[in-house]
Amino acid sequence: MAVATATSSTIELRHQGDSTPTSLQCNDRQATPPPEEDGLDVDGRQEFSLPPVDGGKDAWFFLAACFFVEALTWGFPFSFGVFQDYYSTHEPFAGSEQIPIIGTCAMGIMYLDIPVVMGIQRMYPRFSRWSPMMGLVLMCVSLAASSFSQNVGHLVVTQGVFYAVGGSISYCPCLLYMDEWFARRKGLAYGIMWSGTGLAGFSLPLILEVFLRRYGFRTTLRIWAVALLVLTMPLAFFIKPRLPRAATTHIKPFKLGFALTKTFMLHQVANTVQGLGFFLPGIYLPTYARSIGASSFTSALTLLLVNVASTVGCAVMGSLTDHLHVTTCLMISAAGAGLGTFLLWGFATSIPVLFVFCIIYGLFAGPYTSAWTGIMKDVATEMGTYRGTSGGSSFDPTMVIGVLSTGRGIGNIVSGPLSQVLVKGMPWKGEALGGYGTGYGPLIAFTGVTAVMSGATFVWHRVGWM
């Protein structure tokens, strides 16, 4: 509970003793909302209360709503492989080489435009409050419109571009407000929210595959548009700020000087490299499984195992960032994903071994982004240390996550065409051991190398570069 008075102008923004800089630190230390909007004048003093940080029903309802918005918004583009398989084999889209562009636009644009959308929402708080509903409506309209498509180009615009823009508008308030609701448990909170994608990645492809097989893509898209509206609209009520607008008006979201600090640039390099390799197993694991004798259902199980393991891994990694230095967390992710790729996928010629790899990869590679809260803390600390508290007070740490998303988006977009180069002509086939000799050897090796390199910040931190 927080109380503010006109004499002390104090707002409790985080638990006492929490040294993590947040975007909620106000100029002149704190801000007092106008009496007519947030306070009650009693004996010449203005008092108002705020919900508690790191707990209480409001915080947990907010986190639960964010979990499901994350799952429903990101789960659909992460399940695009089901649509890609359907579009490739059914008219009027069969045989088109542009079908993968739909999924690339849906996911890539959502990653790339997050800092822009977050910045606009920070500048216009009233727009931010209504954004979950506005974005949801745009997503549903885009899905409904895509059900009338007669060519791939129309699908790219509707199911790809418009859906991505709507998804970003709906999702970004979750990132902006999370910093207000959680302080000591911030890493855990982000980890729980981001684990929603893994859960959706497990269940949604199964549901969509059944609907596509029974009803076709037009009816499936309309059903999902209605389901998305019904499931998500009630959640929008709980996605709300903890603080009054007056407490955050000083923040300058497009003050991006942090992106030029050495700490952030080194983290961004490792983050982008990880993004280059991270998405490749999601594209090729089912195909690889079929190449070693798996059935179509067993092949689909590979992605389901990765997503289920990622759900657990995100929550665990988020909690670890609250207790360990971020570079240690990133090294744990890199070591597990790299060794799993080289030793398990690299020598997997049987389905059980491949399943073990899927679980290991999901546990370690999937939660890499859950460590972003630690990067945010690292960068915010450097901004305060080297530029002074007053100089960095209007800096918005949540934009660190936004710019990191851009780096991951670049990796996502580049990984598509890059993967085609890596498997073209089935290199190393019959010339190497295990999985390396199946024609997917360069792809496996590249995935492993990028996974290991994503932990380079652990070394850079130890040698004093950051």
Each model region followed by its residue ranges:
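Intrinsically disordered, low-complexity terminal tails of fungal membrane proteins
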Residues: 1-56, 384-388, 465-466
